[in-house]
Amino acid sequence: IDSAASKGFIAGSEPCIYHVLAIAVAPGNPLNITRLSDLTNDGVRVAIGDPTGPAVGSAAKKMLESAGYWEDIQDNIVVQSGTVNELLVYMSMDQADAAIIWEDLLDNSDLEQVDIPIDEGFVKVIPIGTLTFSENPEEAQAFADFVASDEGLGIFEKHGFEIYPSAKYGDA
């Protein structure tokens, strides 16, 4: 939304939820993966999104580079998927030991979630916005108001998203 706002396309916006990367592991966490650096251990098969494709891939690369693990993890990457949902498939088919994925996708999954500390992780505040050139500005604003309402945010929360603001992530 920042790019659209810089071009004057956003009439108004409000922060709503967080998009957060986490590590998905098999039930019971058989390799005892507890932190990002564990993904560089010998023999750990890692799945990530394609860094030139889906947002989860570019975010994972950015996070791993920032934490200093991007080069060290290369030999462990067994797949770079074209979609975020493929990461869940690779994990469920035991084609990878760990995947870097959005935490909300793990909410209704049999996989276990390993949180990445905020100082190493990727946390992004996701807003709702309306467009300056909307053909139906009143309806657009009504929808944005609903999304940002307690009821709208409750739907996001029900599906595994952390609601903004939270003590856990702050302003990210």
Where on the chain are the PLM-derived regions?
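Exported/periplasmic ABC-transporter solute-binding proteins
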Residues: 1-172
